[in-house]
């Protein structure tokens, strides 16, 4: 981000005075802190049914070897449920979270999504990059800060 900031500053210093620059993104971010990082490795491994954990630190996509084990996986995660909402993907599809979902897309979706609450971040240390533990801002859940799309205007 520091490099991007420096490049943008340099670019804006060189544009004509009657020119505007508009910058946007596809999502917002939320600031987090190390004490609010939850490493869920033991919970994910307990059932033996978790094949892979993907997504982001604010929304974990949990893929299972056996979709019949979903309730057990949710139960294994219960000690940390204060920090996330566990949403079965079939329920999210039924609630139209994704719009129309065709079978090729369904085949790629996880069985379970964990949506972080407040400023918690959720990790499985095997699947998340080490550098993500040092980041101070994250995205992926449904907080107002994360679903708001930023827009910056420079000039005019």
Positions of PLM-derived features:
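Feature captures the catalytic ectodomains and active-site-proximal regions of enzymes
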Residues: 1-156
